From Swiss-Prot:
Residues 8-68 form the HTH tetR-type domain. Keywords: DNA-binding, Repressor, Transcription, Transcription regulation. Residues 31-50 bind DNA. Pathway: Amine and polyamine biosynthesis; betaine biosynthesis via choline pathway [regulation]. PROSITE patterns: HTH_TETR_1, HTH_TETR_2. This is HTH-type transcriptional regulator BetI. Pfam families: TetR_C_6 (PF13977), TetR_N (PF00440). InterPro entries: BetI_C, DNA-bd_HTH_TetR-type_CS, Homeodomain-like_sf, HTH-type_TetR-like_transc_reg, HTH_TetR, Tet_transcr_reg_TetR-rel_C_sf, Tscrpt_rep_BetI. GO terms for biological process: glycine betaine biosynthetic process from choline; negative regulation of DNA-templated transcription. Repressor involved in the biosynthesis of the osmoprotectant glycine betaine. It represses transcription of the choline transporter BetT and the genes of BetAB involved in the synthesis of glycine betaine. The keyword Transcription regulation applies. GO terms for molecular function: DNA-binding transcription factor activity; transcription cis-regulatory region binding.
Length: 199
């Protein structure tokens, strides 16, 4: 967490610079020196407020997660509470549109995933994000399926989101949001049809 007193105007500047440098040289080569030059600040500012590269990466991921959460909440707020299928699509869309679909953000996500396997704090952030996604999905799916089925389908959708994200970051053309929507909706429709036949 950044120390209290960090000028709010500087945080977005540093987050953007961090993503830009990760995009250009990768996480391991993204030094405080390169990030500070990109942001136009001294290395001392980053070290003082964030405690170094790790703290800045953590704040960058927190910002990406905040924006993801805000996008999904905004999408859901525009839909009726009983429009469950549409609300599931709104959750899915939140992961593939706007800020989240930018190439720099996608590459930062990928770096974050790989780093979080060996870092307790980043792993905790990753788990918070995973639980939040599953919670949103299960809430809507439980209105359409029983609890066990909703759990399985929620995990299936989350796995597809992660897989499409991973493939998108490795693709020079980036993430194809429309194709992602089609693939995930095809899975969802097939699951809903399958379970409806069991009733």
């Amino acid at each position: 967490m950044p120390k209290v007193g960090m000028p709010e105007i500087r945080k977005p500047q540093l987050v953007k610079a961090t993503m830009s440098v990760i995009d250009r040289v990768g996480l391991h080569a993204a030094s405080i020196s390169l990030i500070s030059k990109e942001a136009g600040v001294s290395t001392g500012i980053i070290n003082h407020y964030f405690g170094g590269k790790h703290g800045l990466l953590e704040e960058t991921m927190r910002e990406i997660l905040r924006q993801l959460s805000a996008t999904i909440k905004e999408n859901l707020s525009q839909l009726p509470a009983d429009a469950h299928h549409q609300r599931i699509n709104a959750i899915i869309d939140g992961n593939f549109v706007g800020f989240q679909a930018e190439n720099q953000v996608a590459k930062t996500w990928l770096a974050f995933w790989s780093y979080s396997m060996h870092d307790a704090q980043l792993k905790r952030l990753q788990r918070v994000n995973e639980r939040r996604l599953l919670s949103h999905l299960k809430k809507e799916l439980k209105a359409l399926l029983d609890q066990d089925q909703a759990e399985l389908v929620a995990h299936g959708i989350a796995s597809l989101i992660d897989g499409i994200w991973l493939r998108g970051t490795l693709n020079p053309q980036g993430i194809d949001a429309e194709k992602a929507r089609v693939i995930i909706n095809d899975y969802l429709d097939k699951q809903l049809t399958f379970y409806s036949k069991l009733k």
